[in-house]
Amino acid sequence: MMSKLLVQSFAISIDGYGAGPNQDLQNPLGVGGPELMEWFFHTHVWRQMHGQDDGETGVDNSMAEQGFAGIGAWILGRNMFGPVRGPWPDDSWKGWWGDEPPYHTPVFVLTHHPRAPLTMAGGTEFRFVTEGIDAALDQARAAAGGRDVRLGGGVATVRQYLQAGLIDELHLAIRPVLLGSGEHLLSGIDMRALGYECARHVAGERATHVFLRRRA
């Protein structure tokens, strides 16, 4: 069976924004964007990523854990890899996460500008794909070895894959906050027409987790 393309633990505001306005090096999630991730910052999964052994182990943590299970490769939009725009000036930028990113698999980064692969500690290898979303998915599936592929974002990248009908399941972590502006995830996309339905929803401590699945 072909591996699935999954969006997991993707945080949005109650008014549908997946990032705030004015994203830059100081505000990678945009103004107000960190509020979207408050549900994740308290989990044991997040704390463990940062070398600590505390954090909450409730529903939100369980949802976050499930998002990493069975994943053999990731796909990221370029903005999820870093703030650099245009041609790469050099290879000095190595991602937001330090020497050992939390992926531990091959990660395919969508970009218009070629760059050599980048091997990091812990099994992460960033591979830069210039041929578009279909090529990135084909390469990720080949690298995943039968496991699923996780699409990490950002908003524009998820929208591209949604509009192409390529995402099998979308897990949204809906935060009870209003952003008012920024990058809207589903604006102008008819999810029903694309064949998606709400498969389940779970109330967590700081977010409501909604799973949208494409009908077979």
Regions found by a protein language model. Name each.
Residues 1-216:
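Enzymes that bind and transform nitrogen-containing heteroaromatic metabolites
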